[in-house]
A protein has these predicted regions:
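C-terminal functional extensions of proteins
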Residues: 166-210
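Glycine- and other small-residue-rich loops at beta-strand/loop junctions that grip anionic moieties
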Residues: 7, 55, 137-138, 161-164, ...
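Predominant activation on well-ordered alpha-helical scaffold segments within soluble catalytic domains
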Residues: 15-19, 41-44, 64-67, 84, ...
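Conserved mixed alpha/beta catalytic, RNA-binding, or beta-rich assembly cores of soluble enzyme
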Residues: 80-150, 156, 161-164, 172
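Electropositive, gly/pro-rich neighborhoods at or near active sites that engage anionic ligands
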Residues: 1-75
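Generic secondary-structure signature for well-ordered alpha-helical cores
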Residues: 19-28, 45-52, 71-75, 92, ...
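Generic structural signal for well-ordered, non-membrane alpha-helical segments
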Residues: 7-15, 32-36, 59, 63, ...
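Conserved, well-structured core segments that form the ligand-binding/active-site neighborhood
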Residues: 1-14, 154-157, 176, 199-210
Length: 210
């Protein structure tokens, strides 16, 4: 049985197929920039879902702001260990950044129990109090996104793509109406894998620009 075995070749072939399908099915579709294209295609690569051509929303200048923050040794806070695991931390470290996820932190577990809130909310409460430049990447917990907006703090960027049926669509809609520099998934779709793919696309773009 013959099949492609090299990881790089598999990925390259996948992106070739994605590009071909977009050209055939959406010949008039226009990407806003090479980075916008890279993000959309990487999310499609992750999900095999071409709806992402239409449901990924970007606030004005968010890509420039987010990439600039990544280059300034920012800390990325994720709502799940899955999102944290999916981000290319080796490449992130080359830009001086790091990832943190407090969902299982004893402080978070204790605060969530005492206050009767989700651990995702308690994790945000701790994260916003820490020093340094912050980026928030949420792919699973609408309550984390709602909580961040309740704090009304200044952050360098937010990836808000929680998936689900309870609060997911509403939290992302609220994000698009906030003052925060953000990338949001419109509707119910999303996920930790999507959140990580968006960050990785920016990191790979920055690596290529060096």
């Amino acid at each position: 049985m013959q099949y492609i075995q090299q990881p790089q070749a598999i990925e390259a072939k996948s992106f070739d197929i994605i590009g071909e399908i977009i050209r055939k099915t959406r010949p008039d579709y226009q990407f806003a920039s090479p980075l916008h294209e890279a993000i959309i295609k990487r999310v499609i690569h992750t999900t095999a879902d071409f709806d992402w051509l239409d449901i990924l929303w970007f606030s004005d200048d968010v890509l420039a702001q987010f990439c600039a923050a990544l280059g300034r040794s920012s800390v990325i806070y994720t709502d799940t260990t899955m999102a944290l695991s999916g981000i290319n931390k080796t490449l992130l470290a080359k830009f001086g950044g790091e990832c943190r996820c407090y969902i299982s932190d004893p402080r978070v577990v204790r605060a969530a129990k005492e206050q009767g809130i989700t651990r995702s909310m308690a994790a945000v409460d701790i994260a916003v109090q820490e020093e340094g430049e912050k980026l928030f990447v949420f792919g699973n917990a609408p309550t984390a996104l709602f909580r961040l907006m309740e704090h009304d703090v200044s952050v360098s960027g937010v990836v808000g793509v929680p998936v689900g049926f309870v609060g997911a669509e509403e939290s992302k809609d609220a994000l698009t109406k906030s003052h925060l520099p953000a990338i949001a998934a419109l509707g119910r779709k999303g996920g930790s894998n999507v959140a990580a793919a968006i960050v990785n696309a920016m990191l790979y773009h920055m690596q290529g620009a060096r």
